[in-house]
Amino acid sequence: MKKEFTLEIHSDNNFSVLNRIVNVLNRRRVRIKKLIAHENEDDFRRGIAVLLLHTTPDLMEKVKHQLEKLIEVEQATFCEGCDLYFELSEKNNKQVA
């Protein structure tokens, strides 16, 4: 049964990384509901992407491992539900404002 998952990805901050992440999700037919991407406040060369996804737990585990194989990705973590997504998006909005 499909559920909502929050996926947080820490990676290099360059142009092709976000495209590669989206390609991995599209190949697996994972639905992206929301996406936030921003650079790390301490190091502009590092970036963070937070995605709200709609998929199965088994497929989410496979996507996580596939994303961690990308050279630019440092780590990928996910949790069930959308609470973490909204918490991280509020934190990001406060930093921007």
Question: What does each of the following model-derived ranges do?
Answer:
Residues 1-97:
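A conserved regulatory-domain signal marking ACT and ACT-like small-molecule sensing domains
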